[in-house]
């Protein structure tokens, strides 16, 4: 008979499956509470690492349409429900599993595709979204930077060929503009004096 607590737990796990773009099933036998807390911190806010009951998880997975965990729910089980960057979360999990042999990555899924443990490790080996975006930005920025260098080189070449008169004329033009501004400023000051006579 389903108790309200179990129904609520199934609903929560089902919701976690539906809201996640990826999930990784782990066995955490032998990890301390402090180690689990450390793992949760390393996963960040976009990943929920939850210790779950196998029978309730099987029901929730079926309700959510997740088949990746069929036959894998045995032993002390925890699931990383990933709502953000799946690569970064998979990397955090695999790094933690390397440092703490008690955490065993069993299986997972990413965007609806079932992953075995080696595929989760392969996902972790990919570059993070931020690094990929930085590379794209660099590729997009490179032509503009190259064009700026070419234009600057052409400007320098023209200045060398013309003996740099363009650079010498610019200060002279500024001086004549300053002289005109000073003359304009002095003229109104003298005009009222002339009216008094």
UniProtKB/Swiss-Prot annotation:
Region (Disordered): 163-197
Pfam families reported for this sequence: Ribosomal_L10
GO cellular component: large ribosomal subunit
MF (Gene Ontology): large ribosomal subunit rRNA binding; structural constituent of ribosome
Alphabetical GO biological process terms: translation
InterPro entries named among the record's database cross-references: Ribosomal_uL10 (IPR001790), Ribosomal_uL10-like_sf (IPR043141), Ribosomal_uL10_bac (IPR022973), Ribosomal_uL10_bac_type (IPR047865), Ribosomal_uL10_CS_bac (IPR002363)
Keyword Transport tagged: no
Alphabetical keyword list: Ribonucleoprotein, Ribosomal protein, RNA-binding, rRNA-binding
Family, per entry: Belongs to the universal ribosomal protein uL10 family.
Its biological purpose: Forms part of the ribosomal stalk, playing a central role in the interaction of the ribosome with GTP-bound translation factors.
HAMAP family hit by this protein: Ribosomal_uL10
Name listed for the protein in its UniProt record: Large ribosomal subunit protein uL10
Species of provenance: Pseudarthrobacter chlorophenolicus (strain ATCC 700700 / DSM 12829 / CIP 107037 / JCM 12360 / KCTC 9906 / NCIMB 13794 / A6)
């Amino acid at each position: 008979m389903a108790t309200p607590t179990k129904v609520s737990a199934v609903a929560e796990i089902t919701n976690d499956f539906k809201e996640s773009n990826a999930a990784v099933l782990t066995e955490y036998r032998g990890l301390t509470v402090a180690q689990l807390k450390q793992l949760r911190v390393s996963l960040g806010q976009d990943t929920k690492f939850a210790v779950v009951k196998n029978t309730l998880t099987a029901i929730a997975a079926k309700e959510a349409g997740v088949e990746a965990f069929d036959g894998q729910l045995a032993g002390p089980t925890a699931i990383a429900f990933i709502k953000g960057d799946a690569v970064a979360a998979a990397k955090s999990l695999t790094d933690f599993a390397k440092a703490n042999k008690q955490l065993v990555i069993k299986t997972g899924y990413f965007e609806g595709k079932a992953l075995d443990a080696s595929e989760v490790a392969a996902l972790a080996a990919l570059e993070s979204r931020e690094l990929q975006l930085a590379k794209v930005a660099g590729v997009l920025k490179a032509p503009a930077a190259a064009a700026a260098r070419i234009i600057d080189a052409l400007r320098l070449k023209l200045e060398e060929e013309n003996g740099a008169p363009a650079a010498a004329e610019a200060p002279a033009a500024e001086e004549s503009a300053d002289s005109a501004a000073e003359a304009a400023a002095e003229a109104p000051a003298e005009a009222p004096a002339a009216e008094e006579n």
